[in-house]
């Protein structure tokens, strides 16, 4: 786009020159077979000019060899490629009838210049390409509307445009005005459509993120009973209390009361508590007392038996007195004395032998070192 300067008497203006030749025209849609046939003909004439001659030579060689199959297959091709140049080509005659543009007709007739592939595609197109182009235009239009709706950009009133001075025509201002770049920091404003994708932490949280945040927060009011419920539960009951009756009993099955009986169904209200721990039977209480007595007595007798055993070992008593003392001990003390004293290999079978052994073992053994012998020195001479 070029801008031309137009000088007037009063003011100077920048006017965009109007070029009428640069008008865009949509290509003419053709049927798919016709479009492909014309395109193949142009490619063959431009890039493979000797291809018809080569095919004709192959057909002639097949006739000389006698390959009738190749003759039957190339029968239609011989009619195309063995025709003289000045004769009418059926393909060249068919293409101009499909075209509408006058310049394209003249180029296809071959009077001035051969038509190129680019010019052919600019003038003509297939029906499939045309329908696809319409779909792309609709998509771009929807994207532009979405862009305007999302970012607040309106083509009629551009907010970020340079204020020019000296322009009288508003159309000229719109044609050369451009949008200023945003000076703020670029942030990621993309919002995913799929809830499983990562949700960006932008300045403005989406409704989905707010709902998730509310569901994960723990509120103190929701963790217990409300105050109104507690007050209602603590209020005294206004229901009439049925007076207890001595002759009436609560409903029970095999001695077990029906706990789930509603108020009013039972014949009376009992003051008994069905959730107490029952008292231990007398048999179990006597057994526990007996066990405690035996444990305390066994502890005392063990201490006394150990003392008596030690005195018996250290005393000068006869075997009969020792046996009498052993009979007064408990079985555990007797086993201890028998294991440590009577059946020990270090002691004899009689108390006298044990006494001598005890005396022997009680005497401490002292280790001594012999003093080395010192040679006698000469006597000190007497002083006169």
UniProtKB/Swiss-Prot annotation:
The keyword Repeat does not apply. The keyword Nucleus applies. This is Stress response protein bis1. Belongs to the ESS2 family. It comes from the Eukaryota. InterPro entries: Nuclear_protein_DGCR14_ESS-2. It is found in: Nucleus; Cytoplasm, Cytoskeleton, Spindle. Pfam families: Es2. One of its GO terms (cellular component) is nucleus. PANTHER family: ES-2 PROTEIN - RELATED (PTHR12940), SPLICING FACTOR ESS-2 HOMOLOG (PTHR12940:SF0). Keywords: Cytoplasm, Cytoskeleton, Microtubule, Nucleus.
């Amino acid at each position: 786009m070029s801008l031309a300067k137009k000088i007037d008497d009063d003011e100077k203006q920048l006017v965009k020159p109007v070029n009428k030749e640069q008008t865009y025209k949509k290509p003419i849609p053709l049927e798919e077979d016709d479009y492909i046939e014309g395109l193949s003909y142009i490619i063959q004439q431009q890039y493979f000019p000797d291809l018809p001659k080569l095919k004709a030579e192959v057909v002639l060689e097949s006739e000389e060899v006698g390959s009738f199959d190749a003759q039957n297959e190339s029968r239609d091709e011989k009619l195309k490629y063995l025709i003289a140049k000045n004769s009418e080509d059926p393909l060249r005659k068919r293409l101009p009838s499909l075209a509408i543009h006058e310049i394209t007709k003249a180029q296809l007739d071959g009077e001035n210049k051969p038509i190129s592939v680019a010019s052919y595609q600019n003038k003509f197109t297939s029906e499939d390409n045309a329908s696809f182009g319409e779909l792309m235009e609709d998509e771009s239009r929807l994207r532009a509307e979405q862009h305007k709706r999302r970012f607040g950009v309106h083509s009629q009133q551009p907010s970020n445009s340079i204020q020019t001075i000296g322009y009288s025509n508003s159309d000229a201002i719109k044609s050369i005005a451009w949008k200023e770049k945003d000076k703020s920091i670029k942030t990621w404003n993309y919002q995913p459509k799929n809830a499983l994708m990562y949700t960006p932490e932008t300045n403005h949280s989406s409704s989905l993120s707010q709902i998730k945040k509310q569901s994960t927060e723990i509120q103190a009011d929701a963790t217990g009973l409300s105050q109104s419920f507690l007050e209602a539960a603590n209020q005294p009951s206004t229901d009439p209390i049925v007076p207890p009756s001595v002759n009436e009993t609560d409903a029970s099955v095999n001695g077990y009361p029906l706990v789930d009986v509603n108020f009013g169904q039972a014949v009376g209200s009992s003051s008994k508590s069905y959730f107490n721990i029952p008292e231990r039977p007398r048999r179990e209480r006597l057994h526990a007392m007996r066990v405690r007595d035996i444990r305390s007595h066994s502890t005392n007798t063990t201490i006394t038996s150990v003392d008596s055993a030690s005195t018996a070992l250290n005393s000068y008593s006869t075997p009969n007195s020792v046996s009498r003392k052993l009979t007064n001990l408990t079985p555990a003390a007797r086993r201890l004395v028998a294991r440590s004293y009577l059946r020990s290999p270090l002691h004899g079978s009689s108390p006298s032998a044990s006494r001598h052994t005890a005396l022997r073992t009680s005497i401490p053994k002292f280790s001594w070192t012999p003093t080395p012998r010192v040679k006698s020195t000469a006597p000190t001479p007497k002083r006169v």
